[in-house]
């Protein structure tokens, strides 16, 4: 009896027959046409009796009157005898009643495959064995981290991952996966719930209809598709965007707070007017900062309060909640201050919309450097001809011209981070590193 553990080599062959044949026809052709061809030492039946030839495995299927398949023959004879057996298979020219061809695809050395598996497993075991212990300096952080992450739970019949305050809160943040919920918990945000895939669970659909909802997905095509499906099946109030190309699970605490603070009402997303909304918010902030009266001398300055819409519960009710035994008083103060207007915040979006106002309806293209300064300005019609001469290190491009797929691909080769234009048509491949900003 042949033992599988004694296999040294496997002969892989492909067979093609001009007609419909079965597995039994292929096996019969092998034994019938090889019999007496190689001498008594390599007689197939004798090799099987001695345990040197394994079971001949045949997988065959028929299509349009022809049969195609694969043959695997395990052997435990030496290399030369295995090569002779493989070559003899190519002499078979009939299978059953049909003309056929058999070709050797490869001869696999099973021992090499086993050695490779041994090496890979040994590497994994070595990494586990040599895993370093916890740094004493990070013990406190590790304990705090575990307390936050342990609070993640599952809710509903779909068992979707969620923060501990999702059911009690009047506002929720919908993210992509469990890792995103954990990252928001690290930032002190406890009202996040994950969709876990492109199919929106019924639990989340019902929650979105009852609560103020902010969608917060990855800045890639996958996140865009999930957002589109979420908007089709339920009610969403706001959309928050991370930096284009970045995942929510990789964001720092400051980046998460900034993205949620700059959330956009869903009406502007549906009408593709995100840029217009951000520009209007900027002008309102500037106006309010000019009109705000100075407090009287000797009086205590008023505590900052955000506007009263229900959407504030997404941030103010959940993010500023003190985490027992996990967040110190100093961290709570820092967390509150994160929601105040940040005068030193990155001013790139403001610079972008300034350039948009200056380029709009002028038929020009403006190339923006990393610091927001204008590097060059050309007529929009000449941009495609002079793309090759553009200097590297550009932050973005603002152009008063319709953008198609060909022009977008050329711009992406220069490493820009954003592209502002009146419209984008025929875009089927969106580069992950570029954020498109439409304006009218």
Swiss-Prot record:
Primary enzyme class: transferase
Domain Toprim, residue spans: 170-256
Domain of life: Archaea
Swiss-Prot/TrEMBL catalytic activity: ssDNA + n NTP = ssDNA/pppN(pN)n-1 hybrid + (n-1) diphosphate
Example of a GO biological process term: DNA replication, synthesis of primer
Amino-acid positions noted as binding Mg(2+) 1 in the UniProt annotation, renumbered to this chain: 176, 218
Keyword Thylakoid belongs to the record: no
Binding site for Mg(2+) 2: 218, 220
Cofactor note: Binds two Mg(2+) per subunit.
Molecular function GO labels: DNA-directed RNA polymerase activity; metal ion binding; poly(A) binding
Annotated Polar residues bias: 280-290
Keyword annotations of the record: DNA replication, DNA-directed RNA polymerase, Magnesium, Metal-binding, Nucleotidyltransferase, Primosome, Transcription, Transferase
Pfam families, A to Z: Toprim_4 (PF13662)
Cross-referenced CDD domains: TOPRIM_primases
Cofactor(s) for this UniProt protein: Mg(2+)
Functional summary from the UniProt entry: RNA polymerase that catalyzes the synthesis of short RNA molecules used as primers for DNA polymerase during DNA replication.
Binding partners and assembly: Forms a ternary complex with MCM helicase and DNA.
Protein's name according to its UniProt entry: DNA primase DnaG
Gene: dnaG
């Amino acid at each position: 009896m042949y033992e599988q553990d004694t296999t040294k080599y496997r002969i892989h062959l492909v067979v093609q027959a001009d007609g419909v044949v079965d597995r039994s026809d292929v096996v019969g052709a092998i034994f019938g046409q090889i019999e007496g061809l190689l001498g008594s030492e390599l007689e197939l039946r004798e090799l099987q009796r001695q345990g040197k030839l394994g079971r001949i495995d045949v997988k065959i299927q028929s299509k349009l009157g022809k049969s195609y398949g694969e043959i695997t023959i395990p052997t435990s004879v030496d290399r030369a005898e295995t090569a002779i057996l493989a070559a003899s298979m190519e002499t078979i020219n009939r299978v059953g009643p049909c003309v056929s061809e058999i070709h050797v695809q490869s001869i696999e050395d099973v021992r090499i495959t086993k050695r490779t598996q041994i090496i890979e497993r040994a590497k994994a075991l070595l990494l586990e064995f040599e895993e370093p212990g916890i740094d004493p300096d990070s013990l406190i952080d590790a304990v705090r981290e575990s307390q936050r992450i342990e609070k993640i739970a599952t809710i509903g019949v779909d068992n979707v991952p969620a923060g501990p305050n999702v059911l009690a809160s009047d506002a929720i943040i919908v993210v992509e996966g469990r890792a995103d919920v954990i990252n928001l918990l690290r930032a002190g945000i406890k009202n996040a719930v994950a969709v876990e895939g492109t199919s929106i669970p019924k639990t989340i659909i019902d929650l979105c209809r009852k609560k103020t909802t902010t969608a917060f997905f990855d800045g890639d095509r996958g996140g865009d598709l999930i957002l589109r499906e979420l908007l089709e099946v339920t009610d969403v109030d706001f959309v928050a965007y991370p930096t284009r190309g970045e995942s929510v699970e990789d964001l720092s605490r400051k980046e998460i707070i900034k993205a949620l603070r700059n959330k956009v009402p869903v009406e502007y997303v549906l009408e593709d007017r995100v840029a217009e909304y951000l520009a209007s918010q900027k002008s309102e902030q500037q106006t309010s900062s000019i009109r705000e009266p100075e407090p009287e001398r000797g009086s205590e300055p008023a505590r900052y309060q955000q506007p009263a819409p229900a959407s504030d519960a997404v941030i103010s009710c959940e993010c500023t909640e003190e985490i027992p035994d996990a967040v110190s008083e100093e961290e709570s103060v820092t967390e509150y201050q994160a929601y105040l207007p940040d005068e030193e915040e990155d001013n790139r979006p403001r610079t972008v919309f300034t350039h948009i106002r200056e380029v709009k309806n002028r038929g020009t293209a403006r190339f923006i450097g990393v610091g927001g300064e204008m590097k060059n300005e050309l007529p929009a019609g000449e941009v495609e001809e002079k793309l090759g001469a553009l200097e590297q290190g550009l932050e973005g491009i603002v152009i008063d011209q319709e953008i198609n797929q060909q022009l977008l691909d050329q711009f992406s080769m220069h490493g820009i981070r954003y592209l502002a234009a009146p419209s984008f048509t025929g875009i089927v491949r969106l580069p992950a590193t570029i954020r498109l900003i439409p304006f009218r």
